[in-house]
Amino acid sequence: MKKQKTTSQKRKTGAYCRNKGHRYETKIAQELRNLGFTDVVTSRSESKSMDDKKVDLVDRSGKLPCYIQLKNTVNTPQYHAIKKECPLKDKPFIVIWNKQVKKEKVFGSAGEVVIMDKNFFFFFLSK
């Protein structure tokens, strides 16, 4: 007879991962609003079309200087593949990645990084 997996060994369901991703989108949207981008919302709440274009955060006022895709994953996001799927080319495209690592029974953040084109990075340095 096979042993059943204990709760700590169970693989997280798709719904769990999806909800964790949604919470991360909401968190980053709030952080951007706190920085003065008061019209930033998640694309899930604003525009299915933008969500389909790989844009997770929408700035209804247009002040945000880039398109943002958020990733809350263990593996490194494939920046170039994700960017290629976004048909919007009028603003730079960035990925904010919240690296997940196993911490005892659950996954937690190892830190957050931004992945962007070098020219957009240099643009910020020149300000």
Regions found by a protein language model. Give the residues of each.
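Short glycine-/polar-rich loops that comprise or flank the Walker A/P-loop
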Residues: 90-92
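Domain-level recognition of nuclease-like catalytic cores that cleave nucleotide substrates
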Residues: 94-127
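Catalytic centers of nucleases
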Residues: 11-88
